[in-house]
């Protein structure tokens, strides 16, 4: 399969690239291609990873069988100031909206779009077990994840299956 990955240099993305690179052709969207190559080339198994620096560089999503969207400003690296919250949100929402637009306009869209989310959709429940039926708690992480998932789910589902992680 030919797979497009955003957020490929993050914690989950690096593990995913390592796992998939032996059997699939991977293209990673990254802001810093040089740094991404340094990080990921040693992880990829017998299969070189391709890199692009912008979703806009993709003419048509038809070449991809799947898209894995893990992009986003790290959530735990800095204090959640108003400006940091904005970066956290926009880095996820804007990237996802760009991908959705590309998928929906593709001549032959990918079969699946996997888009990140987080346990944060449920908020701080302490030791309480949560499931998909657990009602969300209104706080920053819930609002972040709820909108992120809502944007991902605007993909035309007739052609592309959407999975939020």
Can you say where each PLM-predicted feature lies in the sequence?
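Flexible cofactor-recognition loop at the NAD(P)H-binding site
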Residues: 10, 72-73, 119
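N-terminal Rossmann-fold cofactor-binding loop
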Residues: 29-34
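NAD(P)H-binding glycine-rich loop region in Rossmannoid oxidoreductase-like domains
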Residues: 44-98
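Short-chain dehydrogenase/reductase
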Residues: 86-93, 130, 134-149
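Conserved Rossmann-fold NAD(P)-dependent oxidoreductase catalytic core, especially the SDR/UDP-sugar
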Residues: 96-139
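Conserved beta-loop-beta element that borders a ligand/cofactor-binding pocket
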Residues: 117, 150-165
């Amino acid at each position: 399969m030919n797979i497009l990955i955003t957020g490929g240099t993050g914690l989950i993305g690096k593990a995913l690239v390592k796992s998939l690179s032996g059997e699939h052709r991977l293209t990673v969207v990254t802001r810093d291609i040089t740094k991404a190559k340094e990080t990921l080339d040693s992880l990829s198994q017998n299969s070189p990873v391709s890199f692009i620096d912008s979703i806009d560089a993709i003419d048509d999503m038809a070449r991809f069988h799947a898209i894995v969207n893990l992009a986003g400003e790290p959530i735990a690296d800095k204090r959640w100031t108003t400006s940091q919250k904005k970066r956290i949100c926009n880095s996820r929402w804007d990237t996802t909206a760009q991908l959705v637009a590309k998928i929906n306009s593709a001549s032959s869209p990918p079969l699946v779009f996997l888009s990140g989310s987080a346990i944060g959709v449920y908020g701080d429940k302490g030791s309480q077990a949560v499931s998909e039926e657990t009602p969300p708690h209104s706080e920053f992480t819930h609002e972040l994840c709820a909108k992120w998932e809502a944007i991902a789910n605007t993909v035309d589902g007739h052609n592309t299956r959407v999975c939020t992680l």
